[in-house]
């Protein structure tokens, strides 16, 4: 045991995973960190394995994926693990962010942790988009065309940027090559950001807790208590992931991507993966191209303003009934945006999308500050009595 505390590298591991003092009352909602680390590990291992058999060429990309599925030993398993763990990764990240919003994890002194977390989300979305293009099915090609074309909304230099990204005048061999290179690189950038995220949390005050108060009143070491607690959710995660991988591997994908990319034929609807749908819905809700692109990026960056706009004296919404209602309305609205992103651009959905988009931004910039001020006033009134 002594080497764990004296060895220059092992003592860092010891301070994070063995002796790290955690508040004794943290619930299972604090288990997402370990699950997300596991997801990233699975993605890197399966991704590197897939890269060994993949060919980033317009002519061979689709066939190389079929070769992985049919000819490589357990290639189908590696590919389905990679695609379904990507969905699990985003599902858990959204729950992790939801936990952070509910329990006020963005408030000082954890603002840096929250900011790095938001950057992690953006890098994840970029990585997922790049990866979706690689199988080079119909959705891959047209998704790449639509999303890269968003850059053309930038005044004056937009079209030049698009052609610079493509490496030509349309999505071609150069595009696929650079997307593959970047898709391979970004998970390692993500791993570095995750370490920064952990350092930012560990070197301030550590984890929060469901009461939103200081955790110093009662703490327990990470091992063995929280290691076993994390293992419970890790086993549940593997069971659920296995159900998807072995019984319904394509449930979360799009059948259009099993059609080889054809630049001469547009698919009936160009839809991204489910985890990017809310932001795609916000993009489509605004008729102006440039404003739509700005709104889509602002929707992600809006998370960054939470430490500023939440003016409440209490951490989290667990003891604030009005904020609790606002939080659940926000969650419902996010799920509605997810549905609308998958629909055709036609009459009821356009209006619903616009209302939901307004409500989404109103939550961050209007509802949260107003409701927190009302609750502060109510708290002051009751304490004066």
From Swiss-Prot:
Segments traversing the membrane: 32-52, 76-98, 113-133, 179-199, 226-246, 290-310, 322-342, 349-369
Subcellular location: Mitochondrion inner membrane
SUPFAM superfamilies: a domain/subunit of cytochrome bc1 complex (Ubiquinol-cytochrome c reductase), Transmembrane di-heme cytochromes
One GO CC annotation: respiratory chain complex III
Domain of life of the native organism: Eukaryota
Cofactors: heme b
UniProt binding sites for a ubiquinone: 202
A GO term for molecular function: ubiquinol-cytochrome-c reductase activity
Protein's GO biological process: mitochondrial electron transport, ubiquinol to cytochrome c
Xref: CDD domains: cytochrome_b_C, Cytochrome_b_N
Positions annotated to bind heme b b562: 82, 183
Protein keywords: Electron transport, Heme, Iron, Membrane, Metal-binding, Mitochondrion, Mitochondrion inner membrane, Respiratory chain, Transmembrane, Transmembrane helix, Transport, Ubiquinone
Cystines in this chain: none
UniProt cofactor note: Binds 2 heme b groups non-covalently.
PROSITE patterns: CYTB_CTER, CYTB_NTER
Misc: Heme 1 (or BL or b562) is low-potential and absorbs at about 562 nm, and heme 2 (or BH or b566) is high-potential and absorbs at about 566 nm.
PANTHER family, alphabetized: CYTOCHROME B
Similarity comment text for this entry: Belongs to the cytochrome b family.
Main function: Component of the ubiquinol-cytochrome c reductase complex (complex III or cytochrome b-c1 complex) that is part of the mitochondrial respiratory chain. The b-c1 complex mediates electron transfer from ubiquinol to cytochrome c. Contributes to the generation of a proton gradient across the mitochondrial membrane that is then used for ATP synthesis.
SUBUNIT field: Fungal cytochrome b-c1 complex contains 10 subunits; 3 respiratory subunits, 2 core proteins and 5 low-molecular weight proteins. Cytochrome b-c1 complex is a homodimer.
UniProt name for this protein: Cytochrome b
Organism listed in the record: Aspergillus terreus (strain NIH 2624 / FGSC A1156)
Taxonomic placement: Eukaryota, Fungi, Dikarya, Ascomycota, Pezizomycotina
